[in-house]
Amino acid sequence: VLRSLHAHAAGWTARLGYRISVYATPSESLTDRFCRLDRERFGAVPDITDKDYYTNSFHYDVRKSPTPFEKLDFEAEYARYTSGGFIHYCEYPVLQQNPKALEAVWDYAYDRVGYLGTNTPIDRCYPCGFTGDFDPTARGFACPSCGNADPRTCDVVKRTCGYLGNPQQRPMVHGRHAEI
């Protein structure tokens, strides 16, 4: 699909005289909206429209639980077709006690990908003092220690479409939340 989009963009550039490119990090809401529209049109197709979201950009499907190295190897070949922009990113557990693990991924990525984002859990619950990764729930995120989900007394930080944000304060679309 990306090769075809890239070829079409090159053809339009040649024909129109304007630089046309493929941007591989689309609007986060499209991962939800397009899946809903396709499910309405084609029904629940196993592993495609039955999971409430489309995987963003050319990212490795999160349901497969790849290692960071597998994810980077899988995604590396696609960036060449997306001259309008792209991002690779990897999710990690709490690595404060093991920074060498994070450095190993950065070293591995250095010659393989052009832009790498790093996501490590930094959620915080003020009532109980928990710091780490909050649990996703049907309505947002909750502290795994005490169950707190009050946006006034906790801070949740997640990366959405390459940007860090607080989904407790500004909830993400259903499809993106389902993917997480």
Residue ranges and their predicted role:
Residues 1-180:
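Long, C-terminal-biased catalytic regions of enzyme "large/alpha" subunits
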